């Protein structure tokens, strides 16, 4: 969403903030922002050495420099199964290698463009509970939580070692309400799930501007190939959107 807004819509906000609770992701954004040349050089090495044994080594390897940690994360994302990011209870990346003939490990043009779009952006590790303290009236805020499982067999929210279950989803809906009260423009996306819909139907009774939309989105991550493809998602906004 961030890169779409900045690059495709060509918007230039006076202040832009990227927040996530995933330390690895935040450090990767910062490294691409501040040292894209170093990230590219490190990825070139990963590209040359890539193979099953090297991939397994990189899954557990811990680098000291932020640049090397960022390149490792990008390498693993580009070469793991379906580009899935998942960690265990110790915070260790545990996705197996994907079956790609020539994975696109190094996209130099894409990284340089990302670095350009990140100029002047504040990047910080923050739990979503702290968002209201950063927000002010008129701000646009996009919330992209771990999607709530749509079935008992699709339970996956392990983007960090901390759980993100029903309680966290409920807490997030309360934060959404606080942002509404503060006069922010808020968009949230999540799975098309009765539990999530119920949370925001309830919120819409408190804040009349809150609206729930169903949209079709393409998803490529599923253990069963026939279940990959277009699925419905919920997009919840508290402002008017153009009719299509």
Predicted regions: what is each one?
Residues 1, 23-25, 79-81, 129-131, ...:
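Short, solvent-exposed loop/turn segments at secondary-structure junctions
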Residues 3-9, 28, 134-135, 152-155, ...:
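A short acidic (Asp/Glu
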Residues 162, 166-244:
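Long, positively charged, glycine-interspersed low-complexity recognition regions
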Residues 19-20, 124-126, 143, 188-191:
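Short His-Asn-centered micro-motif
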Residues 1-48:
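Conserved S-adenosyl-L-methionine
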């Amino acid at each position: 969403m961030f890169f779409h807004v900045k690059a495709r819509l060509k918007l230039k906000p006076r202040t832009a903030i990227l927040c996530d609770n995933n330390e690895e992701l935040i450090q990767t954004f910062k490294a691409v922002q501040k040292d894209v040349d170093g990230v590219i050089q490190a990825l070139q090495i990963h590209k040359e050495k890539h193979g099953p044994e090297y991939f397994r080594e990189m899954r557990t390897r811990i680098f000291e420099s932020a640049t090397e940690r960022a390149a490792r994360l990008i390498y693993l994302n580009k070469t793991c199964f379906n580009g899935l990011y998942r960690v265990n209870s110790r915070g260790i990346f545990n996705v197996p290698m994907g079956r790609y003939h020539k994975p696109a490990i190094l996209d130099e043009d894409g990284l340089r463009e990302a670095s350009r779009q990140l100029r002047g952006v504040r990047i910080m590790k923050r739990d979503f509970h702290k968002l209201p303290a950063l927000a002010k009236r008129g701000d646009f805020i996009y919330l992209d939580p771990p999607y709530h499982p749509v079935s008992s067999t699709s339970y996956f929210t392990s983007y960090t070692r901390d759980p993100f279950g029903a309680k966290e989803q409920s807490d997030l809906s309360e934060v959404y309400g606080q942002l509404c009260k503060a006069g922010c423009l808020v968009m949230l996306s999540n799975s098309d799930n009765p539990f999530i819909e119920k949370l925001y139907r309830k919120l819409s009774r408190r804040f009349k501007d809150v609206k729930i939309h169903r949209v079709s989105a393409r998803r490529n991550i599923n253990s069963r190939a026939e279940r990959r493809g277009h699925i419905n998602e919920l997009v919840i906004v508290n402002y008017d959107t153009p009719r299509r």
